[in-house]
Amino acid sequence: PIAGSMVLAAILLKLGGYGIIRMMQVLPTTKTDMFLPFIVLALWGAILANLTCLQQTDLKSLIAYSSISHMGLVVAAIIIQTPWSLSGAMALMIAHGFTSSALFCLANTTYERTHTRILILTRGFHNILPMTTTWWLLTNLMNIATPPTLNFTSELLIMSSLFNWCPTTIILLGLSMLITASYSLHMFLSTQMGPTLLDNQTEPTHSREHLLMALHIIPLVMISMKPELII
């Protein structure tokens, strides 16, 4: 059920990040030099999740692994325990909560019309449902943290705090962001561009679907304009 996927990605996955924030406050801050292996492990886990996304053929699996990769960045930022990193982690959890929920919603919109989640079988929607393609484009741009979204602000905070902590982590972080952009554009091009492979009569989009997408994207853009509400 799509509602379960949306709640799982948007809320329940972030509860783990909140729990780590609370637990890190209990640990002694004088031993922070020991945290570098855990930071590298979190970033390496994000890269592995991103590489897994690149080889997915199932749309929902790709979005689910995308959520895991973003949580790797959140964990790496939380471990540092600086004000910038904690602000970036909190902002990224909120931003990715909206983004991943919107992606699952769009995947369900596609599934209801094609009855398949295979990427190669859902292509050609830009000819049939151009407004849905617009929502796909906006959501994927948010997923790869393009300005002026909150995703960009949060990843910038995380990147700067990680670089100040250990400059060599920028290699892992940059590689993770590069692969994120690759699979996001691959997902968009695979599901929207090219000739339509299915001959079924496609049902037009409903107002409720556009409203649902607007309620994901508009709050995220509004928070991006005033990030001090959460940072």
From Swiss-Prot:
Any one GO CC term of the record: mitochondrial membrane
Family annotation (InterPro entries): NADH_UbQ_OxRdtase (IPR003918), ND/Mrp_TM (IPR001750)
Record EC number: 7.1.1.2
- Where, if anywhere, are coiled coils annotated? none
Provide this UniProt record's keywords sorted from A to Z: Electron transport, Membrane, Mitochondrion, NAD, Respiratory chain, Translocase, Transmembrane, Transmembrane helix, Transport, Ubiquinone
Q: Which GO terms describe its biological process?
A: ATP synthesis coupled electron transport; electron transport coupled proton transport
What is the recorded membrane topology of this protein?
Multi-pass membrane protein
Q: Which residues cross the membrane?
A: 1-21, 34-54, 62-84, 89-111, 118-138, 169-189
A single GO molecular-function term is: NADH dehydrogenase (ubiquinone) activity
Q: Which family does this protein fall into?
A: Belongs to the complex I subunit 4 family.
PANTHER family attached to this UniProt entry: NADH-UBIQUINONE OXIDOREDUCTASE CHAIN 4 (PTHR43507:SF20)
Q: What is this protein called?
A: NADH-ubiquinone oxidoreductase chain 4
Organism of derivation? Protobothrops elegans
